[in-house]
């Protein structure tokens, strides 16, 4: 574990394996093409013109010119290939020994010499020498290039990776192929002759030909043979160009950190750089520059991370479905290798460690039966070198580390068992030893293990316990023998050392010291005999979570040095490296040992963050945590301004600035409401309001700041108002009302347009939209103005005022069925139902993006969050799937959202991941996606099975036009009137014919939507609909994922009872009674007619053609047709006639 061990310039690892090299050389021939795509386009035009000229000059002249060019190409290819081969032959000999600082395997091979933005926006073109004849060519359809690509891909698979430069892999993509002089020669001959000539040029020796062609192309294009990873320096990470974003939402900053994971000190010399984790992102933070670089790639919360001894390589792993292990280059921020399916049986990675030379990675899975794997990640392999399943009686192993001097030895521990591992690579065996310790072992209480390390003497292992003790294990290694195998090594408990009273939380080594950190914030240093050398107990820290020492050795003491003396009899100076301290209360400190200077780098919330709010006209964001802390940041310059920590038991649940930005309303978990001064966080009112017994989830201010309303978990709305008392304006409690039966999802103030008076509305999961009459309310009485039901089956999730894009004022309400509904703000009539963003879960919160100028008033956008994503939606909503975009922001759940006053940034709070993420909004990218998605009905055809030419759309057309015949009479002899429209009365029948069965309420909503669609503008009602509009109505109203078996099961869970087989069922009598008495109940005649059709006694659509009627509903005997007991499966298959898919349980027809 020693941080002092510097990798030598050249060193060969164990078993003859080469280690990685530290030297980096900048590439002198590295210039940027300003517009490679334009140059490529010009080259393409020139090539085509030359082709036309060649055809006009005649075939004979072309043949002669082709022969001359063939000779030139052959001579130049042979000359340059010979030179390159000589250089490569000598270079290979020089590069057989590689050091830990240089990437091996997939890392060097996967990276190209480009910036992040170019890799996305420019098709990953390599950079070429400006001013030379080398250009980017898009003409790669010739036989030679195709063959070269095939040859290279084959060669990369079978050759040693150190013998292939990253540029050779660049050529494997046609878009990356540089042409240089080769392109100029192709311009002067017909393409068929060129292809034949290049086939003639193919060398007989395949390998020599590949090397020769690759080297020739590289030399002509001016491509460096070094990748960005291998040629970079430590300073490049924070010098990357900030190019135009290519995503609508781009992470720019992350507030907070996961204090349950370590923080690493990865650089110190000229810049103090830390590594820590926020949610699913690893953060490289430059303290001096106040910059962050985000390592994004995980879809789940990062569960563990580790770094190499030289701090060059970072490994991160996550927990969850499709978990990943990613190795990063800390100099460039590039992911150099990814391990997929590292634990397919489990739920992710529990613990992870990297060897000091960064060759090997050890992981322990988070599964019921844990698996230890060792990965040779530098070889880009997809499977571990060895694996070991651990018995469950060993407990959950949550910590692992390698022997710093032997890559083949590891130690891990759970709370009750420490395990020693010995890796026999030649045997593909991971031997282990895990003696059981009990109180009888030492006749003393041992305590629960926290961390284990290898002793400095390398013959022992130390395990720290939460009782302040160290268990010393002796390692018994059998003597080495070349002829016979003498058994595996094992460990035995040697002694129990009671070091201190406080529980030890961190155990590590540095230089010649053994270091401990404990629950009281003490840091102690011991020598190899476990005699104390020095300690820091006066720092007043929380429980130590992590200690990370600088990779730079301590400077030797001078006359100006102020190192403290150690506690030995000699009293020598205690010379130690600087180090980073992370504590369990989410604080990070830097300790400069020369002079013992402790600097607080940051203190973040140590508990869930649920409340955030942006200032209405300044770049400020207030962040509230369940731990009782409110912090205010300037989010433009990323500067922490001020904070307040409330007394224990007060957790911040909700925050809102008032419209003037002078006040900050804060709701707490135990029901208290504070009104704070926005610039000092001091109490604005003498005493907080305590009118609720449960957590205050919502706070809202009226537009004139005369009213403040709150909602809590007991479904209660409370109103406070500003009054004048003794010449001073003070806040007073007005009234409260338990107006909902289920949780309140939104609390919203509005304005009456005719009087400019505030109006207050609340929305609950009980499907009630309630408006309150503030003017008629008085002390202890909150008057209700009206109550409206918003939906039938789905429940509402949030609401917001729809921006004035139309002459009609709307409330926008999202529901759990992925729908967005527009309600008239006055009548509360549902005026439109539209398909909203469907990204795995419904929208939970939404806000209208503020405009930045008056010119943007007619182009508005929504920002929304669902369970784990943040997204944008272009208004007006019309069901076009291309008008929305989303990105994962907090995999374990989003707790809150805020938008900056200028609409440039969105902020998301991650709840229990203790982080807030700032997202830069780039609307032009989203608009570009819409334009690429097509116009008119093109985006909507993609929502149909088979699209515009599919079977489903053809059936829809047939039913649409058949409904015209039906409305005119099936048996009529009059001349048919063919039209592009059908009357509205036919719409429900066509809907049902294509598999969508809307309720009567939904049918009324559809009729209102169509009838009044143009009423505000024209004053006319619409009584017909054409096919394109019908298609949009159908797609916007139908369930986005169809009818599923799980939905039927949920209904039977509510209505049924558990039968003798353990399934939910409904008795036949109850089933029939429910159909005629509950919900939108049928008449008995309607029910019998439906059963007649379902049982095949009458053909489908028989009422449209009365002549086909054979059986009346009254003639059916339901006792004979229906079973006594109906389960969900019987209802779906035997009654409705549906088929159930085997895998997902979804209905098919």
UniProtKB/Swiss-Prot annotation:
WD repeat ranges, renumbered to this chain: 335-377, 385-425, 436-475, 493-528, 531-591, 595-635, 641-678, 688-724, 731-774, 785-825, 831-877, 883-921, 959-999, 1019-1059
GO cellular component: a single term: motile cilium
Location of the protein in the cell: Cytoplasm, Cytoskeleton, Cilium axoneme; Cell projection, Cilium, Flagellum
Pfam families in the cross-refs: WD40
Keyword line: Cell projection, Cilium, Cytoplasm, Cytoskeleton, Flagellum, Repeat, WD repeat
Biased composition (Basic and acidic residues): 1-12, 31-59, 67-89, 182-215
Annotated spans, Disordered: 1-138, 161-219
Compositional bias (Acidic residues): 16-26
Gene3D superfamilies linked to this entry: EF-hand (1.10.238.10), YVTN repeat-like/Quinoprotein amine dehydrogenase (2.130.10.10)
SUPFAM superfamilies: EF-hand (SSF47473), Quinoprotein alcohol dehydrogenase-like (SSF50998), WD40 repeat-like (SSF50978)
Tissue: Isoform 1 is highly expressed in testis and, at lower levels, in lung. Very low levels are detected in kidney and brain. In testis, expressed in spermatozoa (at protein level). Isoform 2 is not detected in testis, lung, kidney, nor in brain.
Main location, first listed in the record: cytoplasm
Ranges of compositional bias, category Low complexity: 93-104
One annotated GO biological process: flagellated sperm motility
Composition bias, Polar residues: 112-122, 166-176
Pathological condition linked to this protein in its record: Spermatogenic failure 33: An autosomal recessive infertility disorder caused by spermatogenesis defects that result in multiple abnormalities of sperm flagellum, including short, bent, curled, thick, or absent flagella.
Functional description taken from the UniProt entry: Involved in spermatozoa motility. May also regulate cilium motility through its role in the assembly of the axonemal radial spokes.
Protein name (database record): Cilia- and flagella-associated protein 251
């Amino acid at each position: 574990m020693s941080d002092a061990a510097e990798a030598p310039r050249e060193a060969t690892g164990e078993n003859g394996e080469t280690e990685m090299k530290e030297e980096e050389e900048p590439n002198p021939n590295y210039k940027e093409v300003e517009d490679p795509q334009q140059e490529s386009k010009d080259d393409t035009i020139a090539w085509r013109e030359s082709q036309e000229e060649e055809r006009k000059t005649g075939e004979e002249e072309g043949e002669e010119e082709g022969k001359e060019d063939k000779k030139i190409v052959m001579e130049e290819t042979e000359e340059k290939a010979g030179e390159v081969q000589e250089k490569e032959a000598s270079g290979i000999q020089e590069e057989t020994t590689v050091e830990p600082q240089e990437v091996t395997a997939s890392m060097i091979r996967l990276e190209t010499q480009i910036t992040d933005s170019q890799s996305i926006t420019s098709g990953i073109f390599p950079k070429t020498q400006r001013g030379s004849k080398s250009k980017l060519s898009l003409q790669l359809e010739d036989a030679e290039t195709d063959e070269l690509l095939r040859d290279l891909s084959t060669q990369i698979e079978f050759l040693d990776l150190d013998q292939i430069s990253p540029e050779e892999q660049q050529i494997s993509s046609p878009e990356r192929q540089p042409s240089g002089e080769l392109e100029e020669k192709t311009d002067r001959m017909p393409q068929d002759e060129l292809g034949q000539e290049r086939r003639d040029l193919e060398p007989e020796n395949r390998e020599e030909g590949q090397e020769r062609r690759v080297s020739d192309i590289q030399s002509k294009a001016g491509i460096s043979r070094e990748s960005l990873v291998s040629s970079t320096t430590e300073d490049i990470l924070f010098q990357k160009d900030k190019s135009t974003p290519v995503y609508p939402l781009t992470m720019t900053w992350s507030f907070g950190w996961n204090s349950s994971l370590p923080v690493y000190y990865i650089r110190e010399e000229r810049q103090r750089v830390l590594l820590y984790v926020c949610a699913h992102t690893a953060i490289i933070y430059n303290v001096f520059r106040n910059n962050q670089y985000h390592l994004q790639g995980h879809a789940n919360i990062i569960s563990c991370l580790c770094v190499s001894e030289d701090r060059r390589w970072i490994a991160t792993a996550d927990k969850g479905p499709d978990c990943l292990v990613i190795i990063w280059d800390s100099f460039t921020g590039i992911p150099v290798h990814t391990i997929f399916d590292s634990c397919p049986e489990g739920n992710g990675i529990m613990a992870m460690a990297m060897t000091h030379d960064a060759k090997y990675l050890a992981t322990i899975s988070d599964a019921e039966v844990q698996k230890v794997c060792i990965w040779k990640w530098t070889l880009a392999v997809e499977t571990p070198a060895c694996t070991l399943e651990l018995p469950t009686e060993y407990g959950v192993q949550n910590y692992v580390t390698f022997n710093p001097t032997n890559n083949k030895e590891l130690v891990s521990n759970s709370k009750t068992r420490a395990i020693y591992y010995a890796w026999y690579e030649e045997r593909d065996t991971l031997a282990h030893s895990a003696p059981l310790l009990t109180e009888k072992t030492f006749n003393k209480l041992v305590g629960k293990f926290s961390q284990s390390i290898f002793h400095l003497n390398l013959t022992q292992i130390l395990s720290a316990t939460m009782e302040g003790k160290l268990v010393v294990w002796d390692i018994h290694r059998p003597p080495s023998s070349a002829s016979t195998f003498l058994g595996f090594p094992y460990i035995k408990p040697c002694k129990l050392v009671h070091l201190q009273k406080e529980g030890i939380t961190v155990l590590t080594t540095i230089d010649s010291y053994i270091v401990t950190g404990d629950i009281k914030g003490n840091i102690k240093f011991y020598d190899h005999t476990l005699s104390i050398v020095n300690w820091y107990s006066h720092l007043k820290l929380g429980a130590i979570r992590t200690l990370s020492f600088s990779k730079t050795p301590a400077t030797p003491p001078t006359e100006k040095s102020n190192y403290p003396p150690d506690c030995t009899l000699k009293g020598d100076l205690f010379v130690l490296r600087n180090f980073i301290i992370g504590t369990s209360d989410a604080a990070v400190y830097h300790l400069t040992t020369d002079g013992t200077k402790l600097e607080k780098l940051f203190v973040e919330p140590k508990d869930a963050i649920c409340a955030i709010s942006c200032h209405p006209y300044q770049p400020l964001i207030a962040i509230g945590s369940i731990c009782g802390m409110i912090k205010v940041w300037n989010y433009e310059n990323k500067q922490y301004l001020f904070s307040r920590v409330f007394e224990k038991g007060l957790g911040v649940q909700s925050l809102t600035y008032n419209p003037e930005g002078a006040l900050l309303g804060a709701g707490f978990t135990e029901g208290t409401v504070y009104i704070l001064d926005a610039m000092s966080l001091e109490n604005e009112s003498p005493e907080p309001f305590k009118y609720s017994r449960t957590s205050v989830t919502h706070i809202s201010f009226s537009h004139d700041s005369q009213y403040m309303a709150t909602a809590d978990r007991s479904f209660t709305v409370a109103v406070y108002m500003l009054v004048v008392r003794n010449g001073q304006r003070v806040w007073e409690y007005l009234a409260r009302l338990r107006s909902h039966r289920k949780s309140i999802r939104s609390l919203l103030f509005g304005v009456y347009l005719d009087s400019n008076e505030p109006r207050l509305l609340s929305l609950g999961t009980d499907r009630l939209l309630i408006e309150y009459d503030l003017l008629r309310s008085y002390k202890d009485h909150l008057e209700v103005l009206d109550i409206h039901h918003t939906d039938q089956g789905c429940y509402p999730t949030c609401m917001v005022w729809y921006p004035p894009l139309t002459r009609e004022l709307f409330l926008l309400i999202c529901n759990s069925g992925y729908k967005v509904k527009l309600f008239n703000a006055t009548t509360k009539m549902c005026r439109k139902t539209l398909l909203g963003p469907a990204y795995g879960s419904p929208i939970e919160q939404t806000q209208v993006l503020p405009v930045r100028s008056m010119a943007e008033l007619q182009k508005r956008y929504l920002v929304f969050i669902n369970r784990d994503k943040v997204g944008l939606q272009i208004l007006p909503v019309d069901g076009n799937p291309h008008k929305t975009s989303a990105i994962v922001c907090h995999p374990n759940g989003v707790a809150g959202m805020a938008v900056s006053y200028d609409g440039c940034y969105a902020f998301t709070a991650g709840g229990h991941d203790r982080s807030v993420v700032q997202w830069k909004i780039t609307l032009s990218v989203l608009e570009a996606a819409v334009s690429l998605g097509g116009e008119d009905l093109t985006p909507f055809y993609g929502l149909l099975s088979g699209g515009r030419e599919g079977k489903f759309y053809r059936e829809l057309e047939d039913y649409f036009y058949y409904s015209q015949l039906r409305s005119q009479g099936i048996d009529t002899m009059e001349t048919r009137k063919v039209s592009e429209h059908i009357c509205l009365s036919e719409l429900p029948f066509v809907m049902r014919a294509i598999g969508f069965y809307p309720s009567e309420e939904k049918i009324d909503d559809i009729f209102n939507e169509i009838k009044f669609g143009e009423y505000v503008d024209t004053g006319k009602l619409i009584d017909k609909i054409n096919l394109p509009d019908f298609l949009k109505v159908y797609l916007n109203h139908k369930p986005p994922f169809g009818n599923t078996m799980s939905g039927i099961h949920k209904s039977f869970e509510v209505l049924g009872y558990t039968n003798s087989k353990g399934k939910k069922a409904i008795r036949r009598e109850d089933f029939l009674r429910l159909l005629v008495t509950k919900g939108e109940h049928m008449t008995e005649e309607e029910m019998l007619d439906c059963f007649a059709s379902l049982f095949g006694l009458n053909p489908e659509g028989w009422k449209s053609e009365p002549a086909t009627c054979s059986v009346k509903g009254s003639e059916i005997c339901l006792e004979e047709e229906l079973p006594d007991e109906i389960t969900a499966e019987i209802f779906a298959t035997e009654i409705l006639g549906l088929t159930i898919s085997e895998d997902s349980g979804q209905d098919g027809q």
